[in-house]
């Protein structure tokens, strides 16, 4: 699951939150960045050799390592159809940093010394290798959970490359208004990776005129939710916003049922799990998540409306069935799609520099129809992350399964607002529009 920030994806992962506790300040903003190397290492007459850098093992591997599986599935699909300009895509160098910042920096150098053309599939809580990869102009694609990706034209996150926690407020305000919430509680852990988005959401709710009756931005991981829930019950909370991981969210749901708040909705930034919902149907009823991509459930809800997601589900089921409904694996698929789109635009004789230039001239990348358009002429900077419109899809747990909610006429799953929280039309190219 992704960290809470629009550019990074829709959900905060326990791995990121735990990482924040272990190493709170691990950002390496680049002092120098390249526009891409002039050469074409790893490119031969019949293949393009790339690498990946993920936390495949170690205490923080869950929620990061599976990005590589999404990349593999997309490459397998492309290779089955002849590759790109007759070259097969070869994910030959798969480095594992085991969630260790020092190892990550070393493995980034290993990838360069191994002469890979690009790094496709970065999934790690500590991307300390970002600065070096940016300096040498290595095209790099991955799951963005830190500001290490900011302002580097060769680094490409799945949904943009500038981390901005403040953008979470737009989804929260939209959901609160759709639910006609009158008393909102907001709860997070006491670490920036969790608290920043929830604090921004509370501020946005208040700015939008939605009453926030209870706040706790210092809840402890694995703590007792009852004291908070007792106060929430006294204030008649009808919507809970949480920036926590799945088991703590479930503990809050259980306590809310015990103290008379079982009919309240909850907006969880993290915790999307088909198994958890199926195992706890009554506790999870009314839980809402937001997606920056077409929800997996939209294929069933709106047959034929979202062919790109249908293709994703089909190909992932074929090549990586364990990870079909995993959001980090999905981001790996998007990373691979971005890489391939750039290769095709760069032409039959690509260099690292021409690949980067091709992607950074793209103004409406949707991964073939999976997400609202990303404008790469702006998506590396804070200006691009705050411009809007802000579009998301929403799913709700109902009787042990997820269903799309807040949909528009004709099965449009994306709802968009401007910086004043006013509904606006989806940008051209948005799936389902």
Indicate where each model-derived feature is located.
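Extracytoplasmic ligand/sensor domains, especially the bilobed periplasmic-binding protein
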Residues: 116-217, 264-289
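Beta-alpha junction/loop-to-helix N-cap segments that form part of ligand/metal-binding clefts
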Residues: 33-38, 62-69, 80-150, 218-226, ...
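Extracytoplasmic "Venus flytrap"
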Residues: 36-72, 94-101, 188-196, 324-331
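C-terminal motif of bacterial Sec signal peptides marking the signal peptidase cleavage site
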Residues: 22-25
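Bacterial N-terminal signal peptides that target proteins for export
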Residues: 1-14
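Segments of small-molecule ligand-sensing domains
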Residues: 318-329, 340-404
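Bacterial signal peptide processing site
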Residues: 27-29
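Extracellular/periplasmic periplasmic-binding protein-like sensory domains
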Residues: 158-161, 255-333, 409, 413, ...
């Amino acid at each position: 699951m992704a960290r809470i920030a629009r550019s990074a994806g829709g959900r905060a992962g326990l791995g990121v939150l735990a990482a924040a506790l272990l190493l709170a300040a691990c950002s390496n903003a680049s002092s120098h960045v390249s526009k891409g190397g002039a050469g074409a290492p790893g490119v031969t007459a019949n293949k393009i050799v790339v690498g990946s850098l993920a936390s495949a093992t170690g205490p923080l591997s869950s929620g990061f390592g599976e990005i590589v599986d999404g990349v593999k599935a997309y490459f397998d699909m492309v290779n089955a159809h002849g590759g790109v300009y007759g070259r097969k895509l070869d994910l030959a160098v798969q480095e594992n940093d085991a969630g260790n910042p020092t190892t990550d920096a070393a493995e980034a150098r290993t990838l360069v010394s191994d002469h890979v053309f690009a790094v496709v599939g970065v999934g790690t809580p500590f991307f300390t290798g970002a600065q070096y990869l940016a300096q040498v102009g290595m095209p790099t694609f991955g799951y963005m959970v830190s500001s290490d990706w900011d302002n580097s034209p060769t680094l490409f996150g799945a949904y943009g490359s500038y981390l901005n926690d403040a953008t979470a407020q737009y989804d929260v305000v939209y959901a609160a208004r759709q639910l006609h919430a009158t008393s909102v509680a907001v709860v997070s852990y006491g670490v920036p990776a969790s608290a920043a988005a929830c604090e921004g959401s509370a501020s946005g709710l208040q700015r939008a005129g939605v009453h926030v009756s209870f706040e706790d931005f210092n809840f402890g991981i694995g703590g007792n939710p009852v004291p908070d829930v007792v106060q929430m019950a006294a204030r008649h909370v009808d919507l809970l916003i949480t920036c926590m991981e799945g088991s703590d969210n479930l503990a809050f749901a259980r306590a809310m049922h015990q103290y008379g708040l079982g009919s309240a909705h909850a907006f969880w930034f993290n915790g999307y799990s088909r198994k958890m919902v199926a195992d706890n149907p009554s506790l999870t009823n009314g839980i809402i998540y937001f997606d920056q991509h077409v929800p997996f459930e939209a294929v069933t809800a709106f047959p034929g409306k979202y062919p790109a997601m249908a293709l994703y589900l089909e190909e992932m089921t074929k090549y990586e069935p364990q990870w079909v409904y995993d959001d980090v694996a999905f981001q790996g698929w998007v990373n691979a799609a971005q890489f391939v789109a750039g290769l095709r635009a760069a032409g039959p004789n690509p260099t690292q520099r021409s690949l980067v230039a091709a992607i950074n001239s793209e103004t409406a990348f949707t991964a073939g129809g999976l997400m609202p358009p990303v404008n790469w002429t702006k998506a590396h900077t804070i200006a691009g992350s705050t411009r809007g419109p802000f579009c998301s899809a929403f799913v709700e747990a109902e009787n042990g399964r997820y269903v799309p909610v807040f949909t528009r006429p004709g099965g449009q799953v994306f709802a968009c607002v401007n910086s004043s929280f006013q509904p606006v039309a989806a940008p051209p190219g948005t799936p389902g529009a």
